[in-house]
A protein has these predicted regions:
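PRPP-dependent phosphoribosyltransferase catalytic core
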Residues: 2-12, 131-176
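Alpha-helical structural signal in soluble globular domains
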Residues: 57, 78-83, 132, 156-160
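Short, glycine/charge-rich flexible loops or terminal/linker lids adjacent to PRPP-binding catalytic cores
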Residues: 75-114, 122-127
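Active-site-facing substrate-recognition patch
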Residues: 1-57
Length: 176
């Protein structure tokens, strides 16, 4: 995407979703800024643009998208509609009712899977989702994400053998 278009999307997301205060992140770290994924994911215009832009980052050969619940499900749906690639949902933990599965939807043994994520700090949730996909027989070939907060996710994913393709970096949306 041309830089001006990407910056326009980043600016719109910043206006809608950047909160200032004292926040504890999923990783346990603290931050003066919180990029509220639900605020940008629930805006249809932003979600449509994100689906289009993230679709361009999905690795060639991807047969299935995998989206960790709850935050990445809307994004995964937008990317699936843009690419035509089917998706599945990765639960944080298997439920003790219904089918009791950790992966909802279809994941066929041996499929090449791209994870879709929203905001990554250390990548811990993404690594847990990748482990669940691998345990279910999928081959994780990449991860596309909206925002890399640049606090270790890229290195942690690389160490796990997962190519990471973030759409935006911290400096694009969060003040220095």
């Amino acid at each position: 995407m041309p830089r001006a278009e990407l910056q326009s999307l980043a600016d719109e997301m910043r206006l809608v979703a950047l909160l200032e205060g004292n926040f504890v992140l999923r990783s346990g770290r603290t931050s003066r800024y919180y990029f509220d994924k639900y605020l940008f994911e629930c805006e249809p215009g932003i979600l449509r643009r994100l689906g289009h832009e993230l679709a361009a980052l999905v690795p060639a050969g991807t047969q299935r998208l995998a989206c960790p619940e709850l935050g990445a499900v809307l994004l995964g749906g937008a990317v699936a509609m843009e690419t035509g690639i089917p998706m599945c949902i990765v639960r944080k933990e298997a439920k003790d009712y219904g089918t009791g599965k950790a992966i909802e939807g279809r994941l066929i043994q041996g499929e090449k899977v791209c994870l879709v994520e929203d905001v990554l700090t250390t990548g811990g949730a993404a690594l847990a989702a990748a482990a669940a996909v691998r345990a279910a027989g999928g081959e994780v070939i990449g991860l596309v994400g909206v925002l890399d907060r640049e606090e270790g996710a890229a290195a942690n994913l690389a160490a796990a053998g997962i190519p990471f393709h973030p759409l935006l970096k911290r400096a694009d949306v969060i003040p220095g």
